[in-house]
Amino acid sequence: MNKFSLFISENFLVVILLLSLISILIIYERRKGGKKVDTAEMTRLINKENPFVYDLRSAAEFSAGSVSGASNIQPSSLVKGDALFKANENDCIVLICKTGTTSAKSAGDLKKQGYTNVNVLSGGITNWTQSGLPLVKN
């Protein structure tokens, strides 16, 4: 413990900088997008909340198989007033992509537009299929 205290006191600025960077990263990640949901929570949302499920992958990937009830839409169409995007600001929305990265960015964009109940399938469709859950060909 004595060595640890000595290290902290000798490297105080480095420690403060490191803690600041970690805090900024945590805040950034929390603001970045919607709530990340696992496959079990996603299944619960589909069965209980009747969400708008949007698959953000390409049309070819979507046609090969997606979550039942999902609509294929490009991230650029996730804006109020777009004919393909039917959700209102308080509706439950679930975004799906291949790995969860595109969905997280798009969820952040929706939050900036005032949408409050945005969810992202953690790990995307890859996680869904690895969990043994079914896909529907469109």
Annotate each PLM feature.
Residues M1-A40, L45-P51, A59-C92, K98-N138:
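Rhodanese-like catalytic fold shared by cysteine-dependent sulfurtransferases
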Residues Y54:
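Active-site flanking residues adjacent to catalytic metal/cofactor-binding acidic residues
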